[in-house]
Amino acid sequence: MTSYCEYLQDHPEDTLNKLYHDSEYGFPLTNDAALLERLTLEIAQAGLSWTLILKRKEAFHQAFEGFEVDSVAAYGEKDVARLLADSGIIRNRLKVNAVIENARRIQGLRGEYGSFKGWLGAHHPLSLEEWTRLFKRTFVFTGGEIVKEFLRSTGYLPDAHDPDCPVYKQIARLEPAWARDLRNTPPTERRDKASHPG
């Protein structure tokens, strides 16, 4: 299967995906609004192309008011109706409701973990299977593929970039969660951990 890095080497004209690959994909995120936004985009992509989601990324950001968790968690039926009428985003009621419910679930994590980022950090490292079970218990609309891509794209699982990709080295210098995990892993175990997240 072709990796994202290989795809972009073969398709240099795809500037939309290149921008995301070079400046966002795999980079660690540090605040709950950014994490909720990324989770939302992964949920929105289910059954659709990632390119379509990238084309609508800014519209999502505006429609959900920057993904400020408390604002989204407070959305009611009028907000749902507004979102379902917004042609700039993916107008799927299940997905829209999932964003709002997940914002409320993030609020619920604050008492014990302080934030969504704190919750992720408290459970890292886990295998992909363990992460998926945990997400399904904690959030809604979070199947295995959504969880995998969310964790890859936010620096909790490796393999967002090929090791020979220049962006891989750039991200590794930022010490995302997966890189800290590898640093603390005996060399004999690193190949499996790096090649097979989960």
What are these regions (language model features)?
Residues M1-G198:
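HhH-family (HhH-GPD) DNA N-glycosylase catalytic core used in base-excision repair
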